[in-house]
């Protein structure tokens, strides 16, 4: 049986964290790099060094956080890599730009739904 430390994504300090990519998912505190499922206030926080989201979510984030944030955007289904992990956003239908986030690494597949 795996320990929590051995999972690709784990619960850490009240948030979801992918240590291999050094990335937090919908963090509740400022972090270096944050993947955002959608722009509701309970799914992002102010002060992250970099945000990663869909283009539509980025528009809403900038309205709420300010235009001076560093944000990378991706289309639904567009894969990008961080430290060998394939990551992509997929529609969730919750609000404009909301997404599920898929992680693929080696034989593991993870899907984070947000809400």
Identify the role of each PLM range.
Residues 3-10, 15-18, 24-28, 33, ...:
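His/Asp/Glu-rich metal-coordinating catalytic cores
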Residues 38:
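Conserved G/P- and acidic residue-centered "switch" motifs that form tight phosphate/ATP-binding loops
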